[in-house]
From Swiss-Prot:
GO BP: carbohydrate metabolic process; N-acetylneuraminate catabolic process
Annotated binding of aceneuramate, by residue: 47-48, 167, 189, 191-192, 208
Entry-linked Pfam families: DHDPS
Protein name: N-acetylneuraminate lyase
Superkingdom of this protein's organism: Bacteria
The protein's assembly and partners: Homotetramer.
Gene: nanA
Family recorded in the similarity comment: Belongs to the DapA family. NanA subfamily.
Active site: 137 (proton donor), 165 (schiff-base intermediate with substrate)
SMART domains, per the entry: DHDPS
Organism of this sequence: Escherichia coli (strain SMS-3-5 / SECEC)
Length: 297
C-alpha cells in the first residue's frame, strides 16, 4: 500500500514574514527549490514545519499551497498530528481532499495517555484519511512518549498503517523493526545518522537539512546501493559538518537563514517563542549558503 513512499523526503520548513504570518510566496519558492534539487517527496507540517505553533487553519493553508505546487510531481506526506484527535482528523480529511499521498501523526503528547488511547487515536485518524496510508511518527526525544519495541510492532500493524518515521538514535531498534516487518516502509529521522540508518534497514529518510542539501542525501542512497561505503561515509561527514553549525545556531532558524541567503526564503525567522539567529553566526551561514549553491551548480 505504501511501497511507493520510499525515498528521500524533505521535512518542509514553514516560512513566516516579519509580522509572523505565513509567507505564502516563500513557501511556494521553497517547494519548487526542493523539487529542483531532486528530492523524492515532502513531509509537510511536522516538527521542522513548526506545526505546533500554528493554528489549525494555518496548517490547512500550508497543506493546500504545497499540494498546488507539488501534487503529481513528487510524493506528499501530510503530518496531521495534534494532541486532539478531532483536530488530527480534520487535518487528515483536508490532506485527502488536497490530494496528498499519505498522512502522518506523532504520538499524542503532554498528557500521559495509555497505549490503547494512542492506538485509538491512530485508528480515528486513519479512518478520516479515507484510504491514505498512515506514517506513524516516533520521536521520543520531543514527544516524551517512549514506545517499547512491542508497542511499535503493534502500531505499525494497525490496519491502514504503511510506514514508520523512526526519529531515534537507537539503530539496534531500527534493525529489529526491519527484521520484524520486512515490507514496512521505514524512514530514518535523524539526519546525522542517515547512512547508518539505511544500513540498519531504513528505506529512506525524512529530514530537515534535506531542504538545503537534499542532493547529498540522494548521493548517500546511490553510494550505498552501489556498495560504495567510503563515498557514503564521506557524504555523511560533509552533511554532519553542516549539522554541527546548525545545532549551534538553532536548526530551524539556521536553515531559514541559509535559504534566505540562497534567495529562497524572504525572512529568516521562525515563529515565536523561537528567536532569531545570533548575529555572530551570520557570516558562517552565508558562507555555507554560497558553498552549497556552488556545489549544487
Amino acid at each position: 500500500m505504501a511501497t511507493n513512499l520510499r525515498g528521500v523526503m524533505a521535512a518542509l520548513l514553514t516560512p513566516f514574514d516579519q509580522q509572523q504570518a505565513l509567507d505564502k510566496a516563500s513557501l511556494r519558492r521553497l517547494v519548487q527549490f526542493n523539487i529542483q534539487q531532486g528530492i523524492d517527496g515532502l513531509y509537510v507540517g511536522g516538527s521542522t514545519g513548526e506545526a505546533f505553533v500554528q493554528s489549525l487553519s494555518e496548517r490547512e493553508q500550508v497543506l493546500e499551497i504545497v499540494a498546488e505546487e507539488a501534487k503529481g510531481k513528487i510524493k506528499l506526506i501530510a503530518h496531521v498530528g495534534c494532541v486532539s484527535t478531532a483536530e488530527s482528523q480534520q487535518l487528515a480529511a483536508s490532506a485527502k481532499r488536497y490530494g496528498f499521498d499519505a498522512v502522518s501523526a506523532v504520538t499524542p503528547f503532554y498528557y500521559p495517555f495509555s497505549f490503547e488511547e494512542h492506538c485509538d487515536h491512530y485508528r480515528a485518524i486513519i479512518d478520516s484519511a479515507d484510504g491514505l496510508p498512515m506514517v506513524v511518527y516516533n520521536i521520543p526525544a520531543l514527544s516524551g512518549v517512549k514506545l517499547s519495541l512491542d508497542q511499535i510492532n503493534t502500531l505499525v500493524t494497525l490496519p491502514g498503517v504503511g510506514a514508520l518515521k523512526q526519529t531515534s538514535g537507537d539503530l539496534y531498534q531500527m534493525e529489529q523493526i526491519r527484521r520484524e516487518h520486512p515490507d514496512l516502509v521505514l524512514y530514518n529521522g535523524y539526519d546525522e545518522i542517515f547512512a547508518s540508518g539505511l544500513l540498519a534497514g531504513a528505506d529512506g529518510g525524512i529530514g530537515s537539512t534535506y531542504n538545503i542539501m537534499g542532493w547529498r542525501y540522494q548521493g548517500i542512497v546511490k553510494a550505498l546501493k552501489e556498495g560504495d561505503i567510503q563515498t557514503a561515509q564521506k557524504l555523511q561527514t560533509e552533511c554532519n559538518k553542516v549539522i554541527d553549525l546548525l545545532i549551534k545556531t538553532g536548526v530551524f532558524r539556521g536553515l531559514k537563514t541559509v535559504l534566505h541567503y540562497m534567495d529562497v526564503v524572504s525572512v529568516p525567522l521562525c515563529r515565536k517563542p523561537f528567536g532569531p539567529v545570533d548575529e555572530k553566526y551570520l557570516p558562517e551561514l552565508k558562507a555555507l549558503a554560497q558553498q552549497l549553491m556552488q556545489e549544487r551548480g
